[in-house]
Amino acid sequence: MIGFAITALGFGAGLVGYLLLRRSGTGWRVGRLLAAAPERSLAQAAALAADGEPGYVRLHGRIDSDEEFPGDDGKPLVYRRRRLQGRRGRGGWATFDDQRLAVPFRLSEKGEQVGIDTEALGDGLVVVPRESEGVAGDLTSDAVSGKLPEMPPETPVRLRIEQVSAVDHATAAGVPRIGEGGAVVLGAGLGRPLVLTTLDLDEAMRVLAGGRRTELLVATGLLVATPVIMVIGLIALAAGL
């Protein structure tokens, strides 16, 4: 029957789209949250926190901190994540050493301030990373914070550094709440991670897509088309086609 074939096609399109998104890792979810979160001012975020009404919102402001630390290039930083990763066949990169250094910082705009929960900031950080690659045989014991893992010396490894400068502007998505001392803090919540990027949204999406931008576009198209195809199939079935 034509209706059954169309319905099966819709189901198949949805399945393929879902599998393509799964292959892209967490990037697609972070990008979707960043794009879909309603934009609010810092003052509005403070009001949400004061009312005790949890809401996942997107904020923008200038990064501000009373403490900073120097980066390798001398630029003042408020957050740095340094990861060593090993290649696992076609499964991508697996992290075996993860070091983070952060100081308290906040978003500021027009006299308003909202702090960032640095403890919650992880895979939701979207910046242009600094990367260098080599092989496991080049690593020394002081390259990692703990014990150097055992792996074949020819295993590809890479150093990935992501950092946030004290002179940047940033966009962040999360749930505002009242923290210690009555200050407003933006963090994870409602089952969603804290997201922060120092890039404009279009560039952030490109970084999240990485080399899988075409796959993500195809997956999005398939998922958008799936309900349309399914409805057409059900109509055809109802019509006896």
Residue ranges and their predicted role:
Residues 1-241:
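OB-fold and OB-like single-stranded nucleic-acid-recognition modules
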